[in-house]
Regions:
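C-terminal globular interaction/adhesion domains in large, modular proteins
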Residues: 1-259
Length: 259
């Protein structure tokens, strides 16, 4: 069972402690120098959580440029403490051998993901929130506690399998947003499209981000307007699976005869 866990499969493990110190090791627990890979910490207000979230930010393009992208595909990132998370940025092009990111924390994906030279990819996290291509240009890190209209989204595409946790049921009769909201949003997506090609697996309720699903509008405690959802299964997975994907064997009882 240990060998099946992505932490043990990952060729690169990045860790941020509670005060933001970054360290990394390889699969054999040898130290890895990622000081030149643009891995940092920053904070912004998540209006769904009604809390400031501190993220360990992984610049995927810089990770490849510095030569420390995991050779076998899986990357494990952990961030210790309360209201801690991981954010993936500059990730439109991933390592060519495929790329899987796993974390016990929630993950934010900022901007297009795996849209250039698409490869088999997966993201596994306690919860996954999409920040559009406009999050950075709009400086939305500083506008998280403002009305939804101050965080306008732009069209954004993600190509990856997701394993994630939906939130627990919110107020009586309100549900948790169901499948269409298992992927979370924080912006005004009205009239904009979120394109998603992948496969969604929800195996648990999220444990760390506990803010309830609330939709939709520009006032009160509303925090987003939904996008046009252009979602589809990615047939790439029929022939190529993301690195580290667990593989099972099905044994079926059948007839037996001795000749």
């Amino acid at each position: 069972m240990q060998a099946a866990k992505l932490y043990y499969e990952a060729d690169l493990r990045i860790s941020a402690d509670a005060v933001g110190n970054i360290s990394a090791t390889d699969k054999s627990d040898n130290p890895v120098d990622v000081s030149g890979c643009n891995i940092s910490t920053s904070s912004f207000y998540d209006k769904r959580e009604e809390a400031s979230m501190t993220v360990a930010e992984v610049d995927v393009a810089a990770l490849q440029a510095c030569g420390e992208a995991p050779a076998n595909g899986p990357l494990y990132v952990q961030h210790d403490g309360l209201q801690k998370a991981v954010r993936l940025v500059n990730s439109s092009e991933l390592p060519r051998q495929g790329f899987t990111v796993a974390s016990e924390n929630p993950i934010y994906i900022q901007g297009d993901y795996n849209t250039v030279n698409k490869t088999a990819a997966a993201v596994l996290a306690d919860a996954i929130t999409i920040l559009s291509n406009n999050w950075g240009p709009n400086d939305s890190d500083t506008k998280g506690d403002q009305v939804t209209s101050n965080r306008p989204a732009t069209n954004t595409t993600v190509n990856a399998a997701f394993a994630l946790g939906p939130s627990a049921e919110s107020d009586v009769g309100q549900g948790n947003g169901q499948l269409e909201n298992v992927i979370r949003f924080l912006e005004n997506w009205k009239g904009k499209t979120f394109t998603y090609n992948g496969s969604i697996i929800a195996l648990w309720h999220s444990q760390q981000p506990i803010g309830s699903w609330r939709c939709c509008g520009n006032s009160g405690d509303n925090y987003y307007r939904p996008p046009n959802r252009n979602w589809a299964y990615d047939p790439l997975f029929n022939t190529t699976i993301p690195p580290g994907t667990p593989v099972g064997i099905l044994v079926m009882r059948g007839r037996w005869a001795q000749g």
